[in-house]
Amino acid sequence: MLYWALVFLVVAIIAGALGFGGIAGASAGIAQILFYIFLILLVVSLLFGLFRRAR
């Protein structure tokens, strides 16, 4: 998932450099959403790992 966030970020940077503002904004938004989902899943995974060790 982090890979796809980076892909959309690169697409946004390239589109922004070429003057495609709408595509750049959409790609940056998708990258941001995927990154936040990745962070949430990371935190949930860490919490589950800590709870399993506590038992």
Swiss-Prot record:
Please report which protein family the annotation says this sequence is part of: Belongs to the UPF0391 family.
- Tell me how this protein sits in the membrane: Multi-pass membrane protein
Gene Ontology CC, one term? plasma membrane
By what name is this protein known? UPF0391 membrane protein Meso_3110
Provide the alphabetized UniProt keywords: Cell membrane, Membrane, Transmembrane, Transmembrane helix
User: Does the keyword section mention Ion transport?
Assistant: no
Which ranges does the record mark as transmembrane? 4-24, 30-50
| Keyword DNA-binding in annotation | no
Q: What is the organism lineage in this UniProt record? A: Bacteria, Pseudomonadati, Pseudomonadota, Alphaproteobacteria, Hyphomicrobiales
Where is this gene product found? Cell membrane
Predominant location category: membrane
Domain of life according to the entry:
Bacteria
